[in-house]
From Swiss-Prot:
GO terms for molecular function: acetylglutamate kinase activity; ATP binding. Gene3D superfamilies: Acetylglutamate kinase-like. HAMAP family: ArgB. Belongs to the acetylglutamate kinase family. ArgB subfamily. Catalyzes the ATP-dependent phosphorylation of N-acetyl-L-glutamate. Pathway: Amino-acid biosynthesis; L-arginine biosynthesis; N(2)-acetyl-L-ornithine from L-glutamate: step 2/4. It catalyses: N-acetyl-L-glutamate + ATP = N-acetyl-L-glutamyl 5-phosphate + ADP. It comes from Leptospira borgpetersenii serovar Hardjo-bovis (strain JB197). This is Acetylglutamate kinase. Keywords: Amino-acid biosynthesis, Arginine biosynthesis, ATP-binding, Cytoplasm, Kinase, Nucleotide-binding, Transferase. Its EC number is 2.7.2.8. It is found in: Cytoplasm. GO terms for biological process: arginine biosynthetic process via ornithine; L-arginine biosynthetic process. The lineage of its organism: Bacteria, Pseudomonadati, Spirochaetota, Spirochaetia, Leptospirales.
């Protein structure tokens, strides 16, 4: 009986959060280990379906880099890199779009639907969801100032038209978005999935933006940091305490906050049911950044 009561108490712990977030939108960037391991994929799909059933509106933006690499290798398409950044020419972009929109996106949709959800897969091109422009990559070379490099059909979001997302949500669907957008010239552009998720969250005025990563969260001096303000994050970046691949994730969170998103989270996607732990428990998981 005690074990049963303990389970009931765990369920009741979620009640105030269900009440608080019911009817609200949560944008989730799905990538990393959570997309690679079978048990984590299943727990992710169950988390998303449960959110929908308790009245929360999840919107998913996904990555898919490893799948792109595998297909490029199998097709023997040569890849040029500039200081570690892939140059995306027309042939490479065709593969990127094929993998992200045609394969990975549909796998995620099927995964969610198999758990009882109603997911619909789209890209930034559908319903004029996103318009983008080509964007060079800023790279800081050792001992030199930052420089801009043209890496091809890689873009940044210029505008989001969330009408298609509102319509899908109204009909009870779960949008699953691949990070491909169209330029005004009609070119397909590959968009960083974290950045895309942040822009979607801002356009929807989401309650939360959650980035699933392959780390515990933001580590300062080797310790997990949470309850972080915008100003504190800027300070950490300026001092070099946040560096490398974590910087664009943090900047994406800050941009979302500037657009009206209440809370942003960088959490460990390697932990089973990390989304539910973050949303429905008192302790949460990972790093919280808020205004």
């Amino acid at each position: 009986m005690e074990k049963l009561l303990e389970r009931v108490n765990h369920i009741l712990e979620a009640l105030p959060y269900i009440t608080k977030y019911s009817g609200k939108t949560v944008v989730i960037k799905y990538g990393g280990a959570a997309m690679a391991k079978a048990d984590l994929k299943e727990s992710f799909a169950k988390d998303i379906v449960l959110l929908k059933y308790v009245g929360i509106h999840p919107v998913i933006v996904h990555g898919g880099g490893p799948e792109i690499n595998r297909l490029l290798d199998s097709l023997k398409i040569p890849t040029e890199f500039i200081h570690g950044h892939r140059v995306t020419d027309t042939q490479t972009m065709e593969v990127v779009e094929m993998v992200l929109t045609g394969k990975v996106n549909k796998q995620i949709v099927s995964m969610i639907n198999s758990q009882g959800g109603k997911a619909v897969g789209i890209s930034g091109k559908d319903g004029n969801l996103a318009k983008a422009v080509k964007a060079p990559i800023e790279i800081e070379l050792e001992g030199k100032a930052k420089q801009l490099f043209d890496v091809g059909l890689v873009g940044r979001i210029e505008s989001i038209n969330p009408e298609i997302l509102h319509n899908l949500q109204k009909e009870g669907f779960i949008p699953v978005i691949s990070p491909v957008a169209e330029s005004v010239e009609g070119d397909s552009l590959n968009i960083n999935a974290d950045t895309f998720a942040g822009e979607i969250a801002g356009a929807l005025k989401a309650e939360k933006l959650i980035l699933l990563t392959d780390t515990e969260g933001i580590l300062i001096d080797g310790k997990l940091a949470t309850g972080l303000s915008r100003g504190k994050m800027k300070e950490y970046i300026r001092k070099g305490e946040i560096s490398g691949g974590m910087i664009p994730k943090v900047e994406c969170c800050l941009a979302a906050i500037d657009q009206g998103v209440n809370r942003t989270h960088i959490i460990d996607g390697r932990v089973s049911h990390s989304i539910l732990i973050e949303i429905f428990t008192n302790q949460g998981i990972g790093s919280l950044i808020e205004s």
